[in-house]
């Protein structure tokens, strides 16, 4: 051995001993379903500059096609350092969530005036996001309009028809106007300048988490806070919580503080939970019973088994197979995940990740610092996950900005202005002097004396009086409320309530008008928990049960005055409670008393070769299958558009059913294909659609006597 070798070994050992210890690096994990952008900075800049009008303006000026001139335009418009370079400040601005209206130029498809020529502006809320209670959304829009009416002669009146000047819509991706949204973050909303038709309308990306800017809004029940919303984060026993918790309780009921510090304020309420109540179903809102038996198996949590629409449900007695009583489990915005591979599912706490147990959301395993959770108790084995809710975007502030566009304002270059294109949360007065000057340039000041902007508060859900525990640690089972709502909070109409069934005009009954004497119905649909049967301008209602008979007939025109006498198919989307009525090449959409339509089928993405829609079946959350003859398509209810790639032959998905059915509908979670007086019933077992019964509509479904 060389004389140098021992010395080298000694130096190596000493080097190891005296080297500074390395900082432990977090393990980075590739999460299944994680969407990552592969855009380079240059590609991001090119796309951004084109989308928001800078490239086109630079080219129109005859300037070079390098990014420099367009970057200078952007930097000047956004009040950034004017370097003409793709520097860090410019890239940061490009990555900031913002309005989708171009900064230079307008949505080029539309022409129109830059202001309204009347001062009483009407608006219609066409649909809602599920992120906030409807009352909170209504209030956010009303307060946003109030900002502009406080400094101008304008007034804003809510109406319930598409004739409104400003139609407000939540949508995702391509939502019908040719300017698609881009998923979560990025482009938040857009609006069109004043004018007829779609002009003046404001659209909000429903892939965002809409809040009041300070986290998800979770209304509480019971407790001692009079239904106030949860305050996130809150302190309990010295620890910070950003979601509802069961800590401190022995009954498993999730609760939250309604102030920033429970330890000092002692104010709390219970979060939505299937252990408190259920929604819809047939159990009058009673809470889930765990465990319960379904198809011979025991369940200790809400499940989607047995359903094709993805809704979580539970039995409200110990044995569903025997009692047939159930309800749908309420969702909690504070723990409903976004993205990942389990969007819409709930976080499960505690969960195991890399052998360690987590009782809150974590950023472990990620290089971007985003909080996530598992949606099963063990990520290591199941690999199911999603991002935890963040602070969300203030619907009030974004709406106020978009309504500025709907009134005729362009983007401002003042970073503190409401009309600056980038989202900025503030709890101070939103309007800057630049905003006020701009809107008054169009409409003038409010007539003197000019009142102060009205002070409004967000309405909070009320809770029924109850004997409440003095704090979250415990509650006696007998004190736990069992009465729940008969339907989900979001199930209300977007307009004035429609007249109840008892007010519908009953047509004088004759033997020919008895539903049991109708050979072929025009359309059949399950609406609510009843079966509706339509024929020649009339309809009947049927509730299943021993000795039940169809009620009616009633006039279609009394309940849905916009509809024609002859209908081809009808369906209800359960989540939004929208009713879709198809007749020939047209469709009408009712939301409460409000109606949209008639619209042509091509607006839904169905070609001119589709003469009618003959039926619909649920196909996952917010999705339907639309039928016409031998073909079917997958239909996105929220976007109101079919996926053209989903076209398929009926007999490929539903072997054994007639190919010339005149009506397809869903009833009690099974599919019915009608031909003449008969139906073919299809049930799904092991992901296979199989005909399990053939029968008469009148005798076997409506329980009509056979004499």
Curated annotation (Swiss-Prot):
GO CC entries: collagen-containing extracellular matrix; extracellular exosome; extracellular region; extracellular space; ficolin-1-rich granule lumen; tertiary granule lumen
The EC number(s) this enzyme carries: 3.4.24.35
UniProt-recorded Gene Ontology molecular function terms: collagen binding; endopeptidase activity; identical protein binding; metalloendopeptidase activity; metallopeptidase activity; peptidase activity; serine-type endopeptidase activity; zinc ion binding
Calcium is among the record's keywords: yes
Role this protein plays: Matrix metalloproteinase that plays an essential role in local proteolysis of the extracellular matrix and in leukocyte migration. Could play a role in bone osteoclastic resorption. Cleaves KiSS1 at a Gly-|-Leu bond. Cleaves NINJ1 to generate the Secreted ninjurin-1 form. Cleaves type IV and type V collagen into large C-terminal three quarter fragments and shorter N-terminal one quarter fragments. Degrades fibronectin but not laminin or Pz-peptide.
Family: Belongs to the peptidase M10A family.
Protein name: Matrix metalloproteinase-9
Species annotation: Homo sapiens (Human)
């Amino acid at each position: 051995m060389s004389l140098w070798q021992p010395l080298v070994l000694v130096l190596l050992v000493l080097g190891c001993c005296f080297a500074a210890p390395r900082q432990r690096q977090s393990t980075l994990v590739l999460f299944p379903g994680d969407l990552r952008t592969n855009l380079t900075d240059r590609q991001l800049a090119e796309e951004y500059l084109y989308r928001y009008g800078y490239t086109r303006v630079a080219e129109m000026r005859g300037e070079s096609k390098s990014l420099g001139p367009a970057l200078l335009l952007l930097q000047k418009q956004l009040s950034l350092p004017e370097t003409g370079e793709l520097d860090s400040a410019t890239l940061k601005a490009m990555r900031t969530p913002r309005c989708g209206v171009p900064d230079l130029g307008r949505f080029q498809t539309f022409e129109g005036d830059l202001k309204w020529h009347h001062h009483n502006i009407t608006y219609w809320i066409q649909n809602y996001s599920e992120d906030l209670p409807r009352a909170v959304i209504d209030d956010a829009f009303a307060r946003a309009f109030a900002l502009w009416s406080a400094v101008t002669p304008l007034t804003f009146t809510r109406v319930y028809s598409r004739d409104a000047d400003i139609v407000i819509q939540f949508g995702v991706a391509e939502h019908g106007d040719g300017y698609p949204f881009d998923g979560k973050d990025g482009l938040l909303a857009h609006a069109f300048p004043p004018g007829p038709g779609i002009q003046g309308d404001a659209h909000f990306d429903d892939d965002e988490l809409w809040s009041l800017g300070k986290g998800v809004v979770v209304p509480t029940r019971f407790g001692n806070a009079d239904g106030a919303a949860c305050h996130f984060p809150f302190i309990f026993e010295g620890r910070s919580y950003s979601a509802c918790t069961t800590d401190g309780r022995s009954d498993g009921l999730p609760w939250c503080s309604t102030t920033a510090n429970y330890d000092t304020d002692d104010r709390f309420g219970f979060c939505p939970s299937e252990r408190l109540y259920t929604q819809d179903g047939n159990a009058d809102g009673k809470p889930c019973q765990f465990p319960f038996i379904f198809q011979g198996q025991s369940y200790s949590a809400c499940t989607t088994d047995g359903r094709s629409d993805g809704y979580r449900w539970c039995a409200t007695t110990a044995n569903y197979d025997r009692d047939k009583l159930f309800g749908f489990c309420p969702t909690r915005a504070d723990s409903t995940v976004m993205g990942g591979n389990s969007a819409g599912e709930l976080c499960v706490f505690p969960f195991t990740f890399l052998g360690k147990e987590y009782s809150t959301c974590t950023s472990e395993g990620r290089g971007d610092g985003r909080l996530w959770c598992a949606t099963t108790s063990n990520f290591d084995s199941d690999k199911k996950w999603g991002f935890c809710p963040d602070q969300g975007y203030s619907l009030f502030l974004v709406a106020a900005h978009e309504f500025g566009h709907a009134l005729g304002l362009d983007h401002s270059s003042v970073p503190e202005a409401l009309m600056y294109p980038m989202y900025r949360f503030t709890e101070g007065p939103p309007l800057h002097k630049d905003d006020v000057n701009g809107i008054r340039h169009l409409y003038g000041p409010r007539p003197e004396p000019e009142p102060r902007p009205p002070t409004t508060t967000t309405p909070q859900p009320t809770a029924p009086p109850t004997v409440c525990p003095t704090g979250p640690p415990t509650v006696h089972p007998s004190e736990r409320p069992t009465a729940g709502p008969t339907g989900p909070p979001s199930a209300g109409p977007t307009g004035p309530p429609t007249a109840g069934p008892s007010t519908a005009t009953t047509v004088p009954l004759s033997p020919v008008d008895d539903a049991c004497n109708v050979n072929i119905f025009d359309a059949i649909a399950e609406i609510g928990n009843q079966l509706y049967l339509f024929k020649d301008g009339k309809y009947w209602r049927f509730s299943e049960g021993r000795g039940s008979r169809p009620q009616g007939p009633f006039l279609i025109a009394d309940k849905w005055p916009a509809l024609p006498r002859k209908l081809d198919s009808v369906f209800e989307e359960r989540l939004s409670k929208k009713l879709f009525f198809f007749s020939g090449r047209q469709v009408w959409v009712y939301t409460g008393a409000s109606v949209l339509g008639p619209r042509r089928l091509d607006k839904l993405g169905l070609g001119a070769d589709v003469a009618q829609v003959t039926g619909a079946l649920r196909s996952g959350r917010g999705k339907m299958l639309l039928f016409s003859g031998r073909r079917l398509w997958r239909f996105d209810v929220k976007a109101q558009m079919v996926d053209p790639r989903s076209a398929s032959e009926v007999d490929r998905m539903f072997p054994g059913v007639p190919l010339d059915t005149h009506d397809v509908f869903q009833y009690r979670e099974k599919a019915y294909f009608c031909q003449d007086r008969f139906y073919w019933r299809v049930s799904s077992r092991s992901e296979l659609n199989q005909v399990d019964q053939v029968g008469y509509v009148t005798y076997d479904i409506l329980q009509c006597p056979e004499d």
